[in-house]
Amino acid sequence: MSWQSYVDDHLMCEVEGNHLTHAAIFGQDGSVWAQSSAFPQLKPAEIAGINKDFEEAGHLAPTGLFLGGEKYMVVQGEAGAVIRGKKGPGGVTIKKTTQALVFGIYDEPMTGGQCNLVVERLGDYLIESGL
C-alpha cells in the first residue's frame, strides 16, 4: 500500500459522518511521505520543535505548536508518543511512530476525540508494522 493510500483511506476516512480537514505522514526528518491536498507547508523549525517535544515533553507548551505558521495551544498528550493541539473549534493530533510523524488536523463538527482515534489507530498500526 502506498503512503498516499494511508492518508486517503485511513486518515481522511469518514468517522461518524465527519472527516479530518487535513492529514499527512512525514518522516521524522521532515520529509513528506504523503499528504492531503492543502496540508500546511511545514517549516524545518516547526518539525524540529515537534521532534524536541517528543524528546522532552512540555517543550512546546510555553510557545505553542506551529504548523505552517498557524499557532496551536498544546493540550495534554502522551509523552514521547502523541502531541495534541487546540486552535479555536479545531485542533491537531500528531502521533510519533518508529520512523514517521502522523498528522491529523480537524475542525468542527469533528471532535478532538475522533481525530485522536483516527490518527492514533494508524500510528499504532505503523508501529506494530515496524514503521
UniProtKB/Swiss-Prot annotation:
It comes from the Eukaryota. Induction: Induced by treatment with brefeldin A. SMART domains: PROF (SM00392). Keywords: Actin-binding, Cytoplasm, Cytoskeleton, Endoplasmic reticulum, Nucleus, Plant defense. Disruption phenotype: Defects in rosette leaf and inflorescence development. CDD domains: PROF. Belongs to the profilin family. GO terms for cellular component: chloroplast; cytoplasm; cytoskeleton; cytosol; endoplasmic reticulum; nucleus; plasma membrane. InterPro entries: PFN, PFN_euk, PFN_sf, Profilin_CS. One of its GO terms (molecular function) is actin binding. The gene is PRF2. PANTHER family: PROFILIN (PTHR11604), PROFILIN-1-RELATED (PTHR11604:SF24). SUPFAM superfamilies: Profilin (actin-binding protein). Transmembrane segments: none annotated. Expressed in vascular bundles of roots, hypocotyls, cotyledons, leaves, sepals, petals, stamen filaments and stalks of developing seeds. Expressed in leaf epidermal cells, trichomes and stem epidermal cells. Detected in phloem exudates (at protein level). It comes from Arabidopsis thaliana (Mouse-ear cress). Occurs in many kinds of cells as a complex with monomeric actin in a 1:1 ratio. GO terms for biological process: actin polymerization or depolymerization; defense response; inflorescence development; lateral root development; leaf development. It is found in: Cytoplasm, Cytoskeleton; Endoplasmic reticulum; Cytoplasm, Cytosol; Nucleus. Binds to actin monomers and regulates the organization of the actin cytoskeleton. At high concentrations, profilin prevents the polymerization of actin, whereas it enhances it at low concentrations. At low concentrations, associates with the poly-proline motif of formins to enhance actin filament elongation rate. Binds G-actin and poly-L-proline with low affinity in vitro. Binds ACT1, ACT7 and ACT11 and inhibits actin polymerization. May be involved in the cross-talk between vesicular trafficking and the actin cytoskeleton. Inhibits cell growth of various pathogenic fungal strains. Its main location: cytoplasm. This is Profilin-2.
